[in-house]
Amino acid sequence: MKFNLILLFTLFFSSQFILAQHTLGNPNLIEHLNEFSKTSSITGREKQAASYIQDLFQKGELKKDRLGNLIMVLGSGHPKRLITVPLDEPGYVISHIQQDGFIKLNPLGFGYIGNLYHQFIQGHEVIINTETESLIGVSTVRSAHFDGVRANPESMKSPFSWHEIYLDVGATSASELATRNIQLLDPVTLNKKPVTINNSYVAAPSIKSKAAAIALAVVAKSIKEIEFKGTVVFAWTTLELLNGKGIEAVINNYGPFNEIHRFNRFLESKKIGKETLLANNLISKKGSNLVKTKPVIDFRNPASTINFNSENIYEIGLPSLYENSPVELVAVSDVENMIDYWLKVLDINVKETEVPQLKHETSKTSYDSFNEEHNLVSKLIGKYGVSYDEGSVRKLILNELPNWAKPKIDRVGNIVLTFGKGKEHIAFVAHMDETGYFVNSISDDGRLILKMRGRMFPWIWEAQPALVHTDKNPIQGVFEPRADYRNSLTRLSSEPLKVFAGFNSKNEALAAGIKIGVTTVTMPKEMIRISENRAAARGFDDRVGSAALLKSLKDLNPNELSQRVTFIWSVAEEAGLIGSTFAAKNLTDISTVYPIDTYVSSDDPYSDESFANSPLGDGAVIRVLESINFLSRKNLKKIQTIANKNEIKVQYGMTAGGTDGQAFLGYGIPSIPLSWPGRYSHSPVEVMDYRDLNSLTSLISAIIKNPSNN
């Protein structure tokens, strides 16, 4: 992920804000908070964040020293004051590259507060900043389907630690990683997904210090053409979470100072949006409401040449919620208040503070192959459809059907498409729904209390962005971390998952269209390519199966078939095979059903290869044995014969879980489940291989065109 910023410095009134008159956040300020929060800047590798700040100024206005600090000096004489904020953030470096292509990490520096800090990276996208580019990968998680057969279930474990982290970037060997320029000690962070709530709050990793850096840039830009008494040094410093030498170098090289005003990310208060700021050492400034607060941890200053307990060093902080989590949240009004405070510290009266407009371009790694496959599956992934709420998925599938198709929607919402002629009647079924949550109740303070649909690891959803799906537009929010996330001793929380979406009361939530028992809640999702052959997303189960059915229709002429074929895109499979149960009752003349669903593979860095060992990239999978079905030798040989005849690469094996085929077994209809191998089931980072999708599509097409083998 690269940020190419084109900044427009000729500003209209709409791109300015008057601090005293604002209730909602300034749009330009919010945009900068969002964009800057996406930058990766682990301590000692702050280049991306520094480049963003530099691009806010004209060339030469900021000086970059040998440690990477950014400095701007304005004015002359006394008093001499320093205002400083950190550029760095907590993060990881690559500590080991395995021969099988998986990557191990080690945390860098300090600032990892709370027992769940590393758990919040499990099962989510990451950014690896190589020497030449930013690459995307996933932090792996054990497949949820296997938890019932594990001797030590995930839900019974202590919190996830950094020692357990494995990264998957779609590589199969260490040499493949080398060709992509991934090396030891490359920095790694979460792939950050900032959330704006009600145009009043912004949530993102390390948003307090990120917001402070933007606020300081606004102050510096606003006064650089104004005459004032004394000297002001603005500094965006490096290395704070490693050794503190960034700020130390600025003080030694640009001091001595009469006053030093330092942003302290470790000052905490939950009183957001109350026009208060936090202070370690109080300084009386008219109009500023400072609350004395002690930091939760101290800075590390090894072998320091500076007395950081000096009386002329004043520390300021921002109130926030969910501190030190991926959804650390600040009020935009508090960021504006910090800008106002720093101007008062400098005794400078600025009526209007300029926030530059921002235009940005995000360049992504391009790939040469499987673009058609990616585009189709990506469109399906882009639609949300928790069980019983599949409407948008259904609409897309209907739009993707060929012109000759005459689909029907049955009473429960399944898409049923029958074509071809003949006595023999076979069916294929893939489900449209995905796992997720629905609103089970609403608390008096407006929090949405959730209940799960499907089987997942609920801790993976804690402290992540949320989308609340109403009848109108989705509402952004955050999945709150559990109340004791700092001190929790268990991986699984005993509390129900909750969402904060900016509501202050139950009535506000109801007025916004939240319906108890109906409204569904998910994470935002987007399909990402992690290598030439592989992609990751939440919801491949079963959007890949849905895509395989659609692809098999592309070049099909139904008039050439000598058997009847029914395709079913079913609803609510994850909630108990609701759609397929209804379909099976009405399609009892079917001779064989082929459920098209995920094969949960042990092809991951955790699992025993003696179970479900069907590697990604080795072709479609015949699910011979699963939790609810054991395929006959006759039917296995039948599918293998079709595959061999058509030179289709297939695998076969056993795995956990079941499919829509179970509903048809009750009517005496044999079920032959066909799948693609997938990693990290029912997580936000399920991984698939495009080659397996194509193999599965070819197998479906061959079965349709080979009635004598059915």
What are these regions (language model features)?
Residues 1-6:
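Positively charged n-region of N-terminal signal peptides that target proteins for export
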Residues 14-15:
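N-terminal signal peptide c-region/cleavage motif recognized by signal peptidases
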Residues 19-710:
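N-terminal hydrophobic/helix-forming segments and targeting peptides
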